[in-house]
Curated annotation (Swiss-Prot):
It is a multi-pass membrane protein. GO terms for molecular function: electron transporter, transferring electrons within cytochrome b6/f complex of photosystem II activity; metal ion binding; oxidoreductase activity. It is found in: Plastid, Chloroplast thylakoid membrane. Heme b 2 binds at residues 86, 187. Gene3D superfamilies: Cytochrome Bc1 Complex, Chain C (1.20.810.10). Keywords: Chloroplast, Electron transport, Heme, Iron, Membrane, Metal-binding, Photosynthesis, Plastid, Thylakoid, Transmembrane, Transmembrane helix, Transport. HAMAP family: Cytb6_f_cytb6. The gene is petB. One of its GO terms (cellular component) is chloroplast thylakoid membrane. Its cofactor is heme b; heme c. Heme b 1 binds at residues 100, 202. GO terms for biological process: photosynthesis; respiratory electron transport chain. This is Cytochrome b6. It comes from the Eukaryota.
Length: 215
């Protein structure tokens, strides 16, 4: 084990990284309420793992989407557990995110010099809600279909460009295969990629500036 460690140490100086992480100052006022951000991240990682597992069996077509979900729940080994964990962690992620936002706001974590940290956090909150909106429709059952129809119809109220926005979201004038394809692509590719980018920025700024002090 020592030779293995020494090999990496000689090339990457990993001990410096470990020392930097372990030596980071943690303010004495930090308590359990400061864990909500980390719990949100944990839920996100569960989402990534379980979501990735389901992509092997889910079929993003209007004809097969619902039956593929049934197949996951009834035929795939531990499929019911994987999908249930995905749903439960999604709800928990939203709850932890809300509590995290309240904690940051009440302790003044958005104030100078942490404005950019707050902005990236707000963007991550929007992305989290977007995950919920797109994922809710993927089973393509009655609830998912009508939720998709209502959500994509909201921009219609925007003056001038409303109809164009709706058509872009739906992939046409009505809700159908193009809409499901767009939601699936957003849910599994675009939103996760953006989330990882803004999470890295969020954590790097926290690492640089540290945790905000007490009120």
């Amino acid at each position: 084990m020592s030779k293995f460690y020494d090999w990496f140490q000689e090339r990457l100086e990993i001990q410096l990284i470990a020392d930097d992480i372990s030596a980071k100052y943690v303010p004495p006022h930090v308590n359990v309420f400061y864990c909500f951000g980390g719990m949100t991240l944990t839920c996100f990682l569960v989402q990534l793992a379980t979501g990735f597992a389901m992509t092997f069996y889910y079929k993003p077509t209007t004809i097969e989407a619902f039956s593929s979900i049934q197949h996951i729940m009834t035929q795939v080994s531990f499929g019911w557990l994987i999908r249930s964990l995905h749903r439960w962690s999604a709800s928990m992620m939203v709850l932890m995110m809300i509590l995290h936002i309240f904690r940051v706001y009440l302790t003044g974590g958005f104030k100078k010099p942490r404005e950019l940290t707050w902005i990236t956090g707000v963007i991550l909150a929007v992305l989290t809600v977007s995950f919920g909106v797109t994922g809710y429709s993927l089973p393509w059952d009655q609830v998912g279909y009508w939720a998709c129809k209502i959500v994509t119809g909201v921009p219609e109220a925007i003056p001038v460009v409303g109809d164009n926005v709706v058509e872009i979201l739906r992939g046409g004038t009505g809700v159908g295969q193009a809409t499901l394809t767009r939601f699936y692509s957003l849910h599994t590719l675009f939103l996760p990629a953006l989330s990882v980018i803004f999470l890295l920025a969020h954590f790097l700024m926290i690492r640089k500036q540290g945790i905000s002090g007490p009120l």
